[in-house]
Every structure is written in C-alpha cells, then in structure tokens.
Amino acid sequence: MKSQTTKPLQQSISTNLSSNKEMQVKRLSVEGNIAVGKSTFLRLLSNTFQEWSFATEPLKKWQNIQSTSFQTTTSSKPPMDNLLQLMYDDPKRWSYTFQTFSCMSRFKIQIQPLSEPVLKQQEHVQIFERSVYSDRYIFAKTLYELQHLNEMEWTLYQEWHTFLIQEFSRRVALDGIIYLWATPEKCFERLQRRARKEEKTLQLQYLEKLHDQHESWLTKKTTEVSFENMKNIPVLLLNVEEDFENNSAAGDELNNRVKAFVAGL
C-alpha cells in the first residue's frame, strides 16, 4: 500500500519541478518583415549563444503538404502540394487555409516541451522565428485588410486563435520580442536576391503593408491586442538595414544588445 501512494507522489513532485523549471525559461520571438534577415540573424545568435535553443519557421511544412488520402504503392510517392505557393498565386482562395495551417504549425512549435539538457542550464532562453501573435497581428490582419480574408473568415480566425491562446496560456506566452527593422525597399532587395520561387509575384507594396503592420504593433503600439500579457511586452528594436552577416563588428553589436535585453527580462 505504501509503494502505491509513494509513486504517484514522486511523479507529482517531478512534474511540478519540471513545470517550475519551464516557467523560468525566457521565451522570445524574432519578428520582422519578409526577407528582413531573420534566418541570418538566428544563425548569428545560435553561433554565439550555443546554450540557447532556437525554433525556426516551419517553411518546409508549408511547401510540402502530403495528401493523407493517397494510397501508397511501392512504385509511387504521395503527391505534395505547396500551400505557400498556392496562397501567393491565389490569395483570395487560399489565404484562410494557409493562415489556419501556418498558425497551427506555430502553436505546435511553441508548445513543444523543452529537453532535459535545456532544463538543466542555469539560464534558459528560447528563441522563436516569428510567433502565433505575428501570425494574427501581422499576416492574417494584413490579408483581411487586403480583402483576401472575408469578414466571416477573419471572425472565425480570431475566434479560434483567441481560444487556443487562452487554452495554452503560459505555454505560448512570450517574455520579449526582438523586432528586426529595415525599410521595405531593403527587404524587397533582399527578397529578390534570395529568389525564393514562391515569392516571385510579391510586390513592394505588400512589404510596405507588412512594414506598417509591424510599426503599428511593435513601435507605435496602436494595434488592438486582445491579450493582456502582450500589451506591454518588452520590445528590442534592432536596425538591420545594413549588412551584418559579413560585418563582424555589426554582428557583435547585435549580439551584445540581445544579451543585455535578455538579461533585463
């Protein structure tokens, strides 16, 4: 009888300790326009702060949607659909589908449990490339304002998004945001240079719209935010207009500013 009561108690204590450790983790998202340099910035941080953990945007998932109804055979592979391509080619038809899937994939990333090695560190920092919040306040909001999401779709999106945020609570909460800032013109220049096939049809005007959304949300604080913990979240604005990938001094400056920002959270 004694062993039966001890084991659940030990499990409960272990769970609570794990939960307490996880609550001490500082979670931040890196936000910014398309092609502002988020992936390059994350590589810079990961090379410097190797004890931190980094979660990149699940781009490949959006580019490869596998049919679940396909009957596999030894001589063929399941068909794949590039949802990102579909959305850019026909935004009015595919925006709601894409935003639903992209947001779901972001939720999956943000609620993933931390590994034991991470939990054993003295300082626990987790960095996400974008977040469930920018999915709503930047991209879905922009698509609605461009009339690619209709009134019904926008209402439904906000309804289930709010429900999931409240349901997952602390597991998707952020402690800070790193906002990578560059002009839309510079982002468009970088977009053309990287030549991602899905982005061939993107115009400067779209990047200008996304830039304005970031400014309203993170700088001017005029975006109406539904979640109390996000209304006064600390934001570190980093100007990345100039190249920092091939400039070690610029890279060091960014690293130092991020280190100081994280230490102050």
Curated annotation (Swiss-Prot):
Protein localization: Mitochondrion
Enzyme Commission identifier(s): 2.7.1.113
Single GO molecular function: deoxyguanosine kinase activity
BP GO terms, sorted: deoxyribonucleoside monophosphate biosynthetic process
UniProt GO cellular component terms: cytoplasm; mitochondrion
Enzyme class per UniProt: transferase
Keywords attached to this entry: ATP-binding, Kinase, Mitochondrion, Nucleotide-binding, Transferase, Transit peptide
Signal peptide boundaries: none
Residues noted as binding substrate in the record, renumbered to the chain: E57, Y88, Q99, R106, R130, D135, E199
Residues reported to bind ATP: 32-40, 190-194, 242-244
Residues forming the catalytic site: E129 (proton acceptor)
Catalytic activity: 2'-deoxyguanosine + ATP = dGMP + ADP + H(+)
Alphabetical list of InterPro entries matching this protein: DCK/DGK (IPR002624), Deoxyribonucleoside_kinase (IPR050566), DNK_dom (IPR031314), P-loop_NTPase (IPR027417)
CDD domains hit by this protein: dNK
Pfam families according to UniProt: dNK
PANTHER family, A to Z: DEOXYGUANOSINE KINASE, MITOCHONDRIAL (PTHR10513:SF8), DEOXYNUCLEOSIDE KINASE (PTHR10513)
Quaternary structure, from the entry: Homodimer.
Family: Belongs to the DCK/DGK family.
Function text: Phosphorylates deoxyguanosine in the mitochondrial matrix with high efficiency but shows very low activity against other deoxynucleosides.
Annotated protein name in UniProt: Deoxyguanosine kinase, mitochondrial
Organism: Xenopus laevis
